[in-house]
Amino acid sequence: MKIKNIWKDVQEPLEMHTDNRGSIVDIFYNDNIQHVAYIKSNKGALRGNHYHKETTQYVMVTKGVMKYWYKPLDNSDISRFVLVRSGDLLETPPNEIHAMEFPEEYTEFIVFTEGTRGGKDYESDTFRTESIIC
């Protein structure tokens, strides 16, 4: 799992442009994103508790806070979590179990994927696990 804030950690080849109208920041440039989904979650909701064998998944919170739990698939250690806030973008590589918990009233986020993950293929690279939320 990697995490960065899109407004604070702008690195080449990504760019940010700011003027009197506001700001535009690149989230991806020249990447192989094959699916994008916008998700809304209510307070107390749990999502995930799964991993992907081939898909790399990126999650960007646009509103609210997410408690993001993760651990490598072949690791018996206890899972860890990070708080993901508005503007944070995190990357989940293949074979990393992940789950999401929503402590605030309302959270919105966008999921970008490299690999099959949407429409009729939504579950084709999703492998469910027991809960990793402690």
Describe each PLM feature range.
Residues L73-P94:
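Short acidic-glycine-tyrosine-enriched beta hairpin
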Residues E54-K67, K71-P72:
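Glycine- and acidic-residue-biased ligand/ion/polar-headgroup-sensing regions
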Residues I6-E12, A99-C134:
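Double-stranded beta-helix
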Residues A37-T55:
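Conserved short histidine dyad/triad with adjacent acidic residue
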Residues H50, T56-V61, V82, L90, ...:
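His/acidic/aromatic-lined binding-pocket segments of jelly-roll/cupin-type domains
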Residues M1-Q34:
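A short, N-terminal "cap"/entry segment at the start of jelly-roll beta-barrel domains
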Residues I24, N49, Y68-W69, T92, ...:
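Short beta-strand His + acidic residue motifs that chelate non-heme Fe in jelly-roll/DSBH
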Residues N20, E54, D88, E96-I97, ...:
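A generic "binding-loop/recognition-motif" signal
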